[in-house]
Amino acid sequence: MCAASVYPVSPEAAKHSLTDEAAYRAMYQQSVINPEGFWREQAARLDWIRPFSEVKRTSFDDHHVDIKWFADGTLNVSANCLDRHLAERGDQVAIIWEGDDPSEHREITYRELYQEVCKFANALRGQDVHRGDVVTIYMPMIPEAAVAMLACARIGAIHSVVFGGFSPEALAGRIIDGSSKVVITADQGIRGGKTIALKENVDEALTNPQTRCVQKIIVVRRTGANIRWYPHRDVSYDDLMRVAGEVCAPKEMGAEEPLFILYTSGSTGKPKGVLHTCGGYLLYAALTHERVFDYRPGDIYWCTADIGWITGHSYLIYGPLANGATTLMYEGVPNYPDVTRIARIIDKHRVNILYTAPTAIRAMMAEGPAAMEGADGSSLRLLGTVGEPINPEAWHWYYETVGRSRCPIVDTWWQTETGGILISPLPGATALKPGSATRPLFGVVPGLVDNLGNLLEGPAEGNLVILDSWPGQMRTIYGDHDRFVDTYFKTFRGMYFTGDGARRDEDGYYWITGRVDDVLNVSGHRMGTAEIESALVAHAKVAEAAAVGVPHPLKGQAIYVYVTLVAGTEPSDTLRQELQQWVRHEIGPIAVPDTIQWAPGLPKTRSGKIMRRLLRKIATDDYDTLGDTSTLADPGVVDQLIAAHEAVKQR
C-alpha cells in the first residue's frame, strides 16, 4: 500500500470489530459473485410477514430500467423498527432528544416510541390517511418528527419529509408534485436560539391554488406561539393523541411498495422526488449502519443530520432503529450557544459514535482548541463524515482533536438516490487515507468511465458509475420514470451514473472529486444551479443568471452568481441585497448566493449554451487556463467578466 499518510487498522479495532479484513474480503466477494445468495442471507436480519422467493430482478438497460428486490415478500418497516424489539429491549432508550436549549432533553424508550407511533398512526387514519397516500412532514428536529415518519410506515402511507429551512414556495412545489393529502408541521421550529415560522410557511405555501390536494394540517406545539388557525383545516397533534387508540396493527406491505419520497436537487431545476421502497431500503440501511459504524448493542450513536435529508432518514431513524440502537437527535446547530456544544453533547450523553458533516468539522476547526475546551471525549470510539468529500486538513483535525488520535474515521460516500452508504472504510478492516472514501461496501460494484463510457482499469480518474444494483437503490423519480431513466441510465448505457467524478489510486481506493454536472454542494446539501438561476430570473429586474460553485473554507462550496440585468436597470448594492432576499424567499436560506457579480453578458456558444467552465475559472481567479474562447458568440465578454470580477474582489 502506498505509504503517503496511511493510518493502519489498530490491532484493537481489528480484534473487537464486527468486520476485519478477512471478513470484508470474503463477504464482498460473495456479495458480487453471488448477490442472490448474499442478500438472501442478509435479509434474515429483518422480520418478514410473507417470506420472499426471489431475491433480485434488476435491469440497468436504458430501454427497460427495472429494479426489484425481494418483490413477492411482505413486511412492515415500523414493526421492524419497533415491535420486534419490545420483548428484549422495550425499556431501552430508543431516542435521546437534545433540545436547542441545553437545558432541554428527553429520553424515549422503545416501548414509549411504539405507543406514540401506534396512537399517531390511528390519528392519521382518523384523518382519512391510508395506504399509498402521501403525507408531507415539515417539522423541526423533535421526536414527533420520527413518530410521524414511523406512523406513516405503519399504515402504508408514503412520507415526504421537507427540510424545515425550505421556503413556502419550495414547500409548495414538493406538496404539489407528491399530491400530498396531509401536512404535518409545528407552530415554530427553534435553531440556534432563533424561531422558524413553520406553520406560517405552510399557510403561505397553501395559498398556491395547486395545493388543493391538502385536506388537513396537523400541528405540533413546539413553542406555544400564537399562530393563525383555520378550524376547517388545522388539527392539533395533542388533541388527536389525547383520543387516539393505543393499538394499531402494522399494515402488511409489499417489499416493493413505496416507503417515502425525498426531494433532491437536479441539474434541470425541478427537484426530483426520489422514491425508496420498504424491503430493500430498510435492509440496506440496517446492514450498512451496523457494519460501517461497527454498531454494538449499548452504543450511544449520534448522527447530526436533519431528518429533511437522506442521512437523517437512513442513519438517524431507520438504520439505527431497525438495529435496536439508541439514536441521538439534536434540535439545534453545532455552535449554539457556543462552539463547545458538540463536545458538551458528546460528554453529556456519553456518545460512542459521531457521524457529522465536513461543514460542521470545519466550523469547529476554525475556532481552534476552543471547540473542544474542557471536553473529556473519552466515550468516543468512532467518527464518521458525510455529505461531501472531506479535505485532508479537516480530516486530520477531526482525528487528532475530536478523536484524540484513537478513533477511526469512516469517510462515507453515498447519495439520496443510493439509500445508504456505497463506499466507506470499515473500522476493523480498512487502513485509512485522509480524504479517501476508500473501498466499496457489500454488493456495490463501482467503476470509472471516460466521457465516451469506456471503463477505465487500474489507477484512473473519470466519471463514477455503479455497474449493478443494490437493495437500497432508488426505484424511480416519483411520477416521472422517464426522467429517472434519462438522468441516471442514459449517459452511460447499462450503468448507473452517479453524477460524481472520482479517482482510483494504486490500492483501489476511491477519492471523490465532486460533481461533474451542474449541481452544487453547499454545506453538504445538494442544490441545482438551475433552481437558483430560475429563482433569480423570476425577478422582474433580472434578464439572465448563471450560478457556479467556488471553494469555501467552511461550506465546501459557496454560491457565486453572474447576473445580467434587464436593459435600463442600474446595478447597486441595494439591488444585490434585494436579489439575495429574493432567493431566500423563493428557495430558502441555504440557496442564498454568497456573491453576485453584475455581468454585461454571459459566455455562450453560438448555439446558446452557457460555458460554465469559463464562469467557474473566472470566479476562482483562474484566468491562465481559460483555454480556447474563439467558439463563443462574443469572445469579448470574457475580458469584461474578468474586469467585473476584479471589481467584486475590491468591494
UniProtKB/Swiss-Prot annotation:
Acetylated. Deacetylation by the SIR2-homolog deacetylase activates the enzyme. One of its GO terms (cellular component) is cytosol. It comes from the Bacteria. Pfam families: ACAS_N (PF16177), AMP-binding (PF00501), AMP-binding_C (PF13193). One of its GO terms (biological process) is acetyl-CoA biosynthetic process from acetate. This is Acetyl-coenzyme A synthetase. The gene is acsA. Catalyzes the conversion of acetate into acetyl-CoA (AcCoA), an essential intermediate at the junction of anabolic and catabolic pathways. AcsA undergoes a two-step reaction. In the first half reaction, AcsA combines acetate with ATP to form acetyl-adenylate (AcAMP) intermediate. In the second half reaction, it can then transfer the acetyl group from AcAMP to the sulfhydryl group of CoA, forming the product AcCoA. Its EC number is 6.2.1.1. CoA binds at residues 191-194, 311, 335, 523, 584. PROSITE patterns: AMP_BINDING. PANTHER family: ACETYL-COENZYME A SYNTHETASE. The keyword Nucleotide-binding applies. The modification N6-acetyllysine is found at residue 609. Belongs to the ATP-dependent AMP-binding enzyme family. Keywords: Acetylation, ATP-binding, Ligase, Magnesium, Metal-binding, Nucleotide-binding.
